[in-house]
Amino acid sequence: MELYLDTADLEEIREIAAWGVLSGVTTNPTLVAKAFAGERLTWERLSQHLKAVCELAGGPVSAEVTALEAEAMVEEGRRLAALHPNIVVKLPTTEEGLKACRALSAEGIRVNMTLIFSANQALLAARAGASYVSPFLGRVDDISWDGGELLREIVEMREVQDLPVRVIAASIRHPRHVTEAALLGADIATMPHAVFKALLRHPLTDLGLRRFMEDWEKVRP
């Protein structure tokens, strides 16, 4: 399973990319707004930022449209895709989003359909030509449903139906979600910087390393 960072923060991407385990990045309008801390964006400023994200990520970067109607989504998606070969256009899973997905995918532009909360939505997205579908585990858990079960259904359906789509486990809240996604067969898990860091931490690792160093200090030359 590939590991993506869910952020638009260049420093966060730079830090995790240095580990040698990062395969891509996902962004959304909220994350972009957070990265610019209330700055009023121009297209030139946004495009420069997304290009920088692509260079740091070294793999697919999902950039989401802000338009709500299909025709405008397609136009915005084309502009985003033209910025860098790594750009994947992110669309909401709505009627207009499906129309835009079909049009963009027909032009050879990769699409990530987001805000997926049911297996049927994932099926529709795949049939519309999406390259990726992004079920939201954490938000499903928040309403007392089972995000893991949703992911299991989508992965199983993809296999049974032989759908040419990759499944991104999204809305990941904690390391257990990552383990669950890997065990359930997700192709990709995308997570915030804090969760990525938490994957590595374990108190017994710290304790063991400290003990090794203490013992070494007793005998080193």
Segments predicted by a language model, with ranges:
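Active-site beta->alpha loop and helix N-cap motifs at the rims of alpha/beta catalytic domains
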Residues: 3-5, 9-13, 19-21, 27-103, ...
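Catalytic beta/alpha-barrel core
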Residues: 4-6, 62-69, 86-95, 109-124, ...
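Catalytic cores of alpha/beta
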Residues: 11-19, 72-76, 100, 118-128, ...
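Glycine-enriched alpha-helix->loop->beta-strand junction motifs that scaffold or abut catalytic
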Residues: 20-24, 83-87, 103-112, 127-134, ...
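Glycine-rich phosphate-binding active-site loops on the catalytic face of alpha/beta enzymes
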Residues: 24, 29-34, 115, 132-143, ...
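Conserved, mostly hydrophobic/aromatic
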Residues: 28, 89, 125, 181, ...
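Alpha-helix-loop-beta-strand connector modules within alpha/beta enzyme cores
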Residues: 44-61, 81-82, 98-111, 146-167, ...
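C-terminal alpha-helical cap/extension of soluble enzyme domains
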Residues: 158-221
